[in-house]
């Protein structure tokens, strides 16, 4: 198994190290355009092997030829958000970067599974899908796993219970229009609505939607990376071990939930071939409308990239 991580910034480097520690690949490639950065970080990771007890070979590079025949490619390249910026503010700059990255990786890997982390997430996943010409099952956006983790952590904090007992997921676009689905949220099987007031639930939902911005505002210069990296690697683990995990991910819907030809976060089954099934769950009218509204925002932004992708 060969896994390539594009972008040696905080998210990419953290993900690469986690991939190696979990021994998900015999070969881990960390690529960045800045000379010396991926090489130095990869060497540092490799030297932690005797302590972390892993044998994965990790190396850094600036040459896309070194990514040849990758089984999975994690794209984290792009500008990070700064205080006051929305994910959509990054649209044109990161779309140009993701387009170039996708074109380059596809020169050397014929049938990889691409996992997108770059923001704005759903739109960048669309860009990579269009440019790669891969089957839709093999181009996946990491969004719902992260958003759901944030929602779960806030619930656990509020109730003072173990995170392991929180089951929750977030659908929709990876932005302010995301849709935390409260009615499927439970704590060891107990519905969230039996443990918290609607006012408190609404507060947690709002904090989840603003979870990324909360971290950006603290950091001032940079954005979240530990949780995004862990979320992406959870998806990689599901693929490598063919776990058939049910995870909320950004995928191209083709009629599900009354939406078509748009990348949006929905529950999917993930295994060795990428997305094996899109699950259609029962949503109430308000949830379904919120999901479709979220998708319409993604569609609108994607339409602005027609010239770039032509």
Swiss-Prot record:
CDD domains: LDH-like_MDH. The active site is at residue 174. Its EC number is 1.1.1.37. One of its GO terms (molecular function) is L-malate dehydrogenase (NAD+) activity. Substrate binds at residues 81, 87, 119, 150. Pfam families: Ldh_1_C, Ldh_1_N. Keywords: NAD, Oxidoreductase, Tricarboxylic acid cycle. It catalyses: (S)-malate + NAD(+) = oxaloacetate + NADH + H(+). One of its GO terms (biological process) is lactate metabolic process. NAD(+) binds at residues 7-12, 32, 94, 117-119. Belongs to the LDH/MDH superfamily. MDH type 3 family. This is Malate dehydrogenase. It comes from Prosthecochloris aestuarii (strain DSM 271 / SK 413). The lineage of its organism: Bacteria, Pseudomonadati, Chlorobiota, Chlorobiia, Chlorobiales. The gene is mdh.
């Amino acid at each position: 198994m060969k896994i390539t991580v594009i972008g040696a910034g905080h998210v990419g480097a953290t993900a690469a190290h986690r991939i190696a520690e979990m021994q998900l690949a015999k070969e881990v490639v960390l690529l960045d355009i800045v000379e010396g950065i991926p090489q130095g970080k990869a060497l540092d990771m490799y030297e932690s092997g005797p302590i972390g007890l892993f044998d994965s070979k990790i190396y850094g590079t600036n040459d896309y030829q070194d990514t040849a025949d990758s089984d999975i490619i994690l794209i984290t390249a792009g500008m990070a958000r700064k205080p006051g910026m929305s994910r959509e503010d990054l649209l044109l700059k990161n779309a140009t970067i993701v387009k170039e990255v996708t074109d380059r990786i596809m020169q050397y890997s014929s049938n990889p599974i691409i996992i997108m982390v770059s923001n704005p997430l759903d739109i960048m996943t669309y860009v990579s899908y269009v440019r790669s010409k891969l089957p839709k099952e093999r181009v996946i956006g990491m969004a719902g796993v992260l958003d759901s983790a944030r929602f779960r952590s806030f619930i656990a904090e509020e109730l003072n219970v173990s995170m392991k007992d929180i089951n929750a997921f977030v659908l929709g676009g990876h932005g302010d229009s995301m849709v935390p689905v409260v009615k499927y949220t439970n704590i060891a099987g107990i519905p969230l609505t039996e443990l918290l007031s609607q006012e408190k639930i609404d507060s947690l939902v709002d904090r989840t939607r603003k979870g990324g911005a909360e971290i950006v505002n603290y950091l001032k210069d940079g954005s979240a990376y530990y949780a995004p990296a862990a979320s992406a690697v959870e998806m990689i683990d599901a693929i490598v071990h063919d776990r058939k995990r049910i995870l909320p991910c950004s995928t191209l819907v083709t009629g599900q939930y009354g939406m078509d030809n748009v990348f949006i976060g929905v529950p999917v089954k993930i295994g060795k071939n990428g997305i094996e099934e899109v699950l259609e769950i029962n949503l109430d009218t308000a949830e379904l409308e919120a999901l479709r509204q979220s998708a319409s925002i993604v569609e609108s932004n994607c339409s602005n990239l027609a010239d770039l992708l032509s």
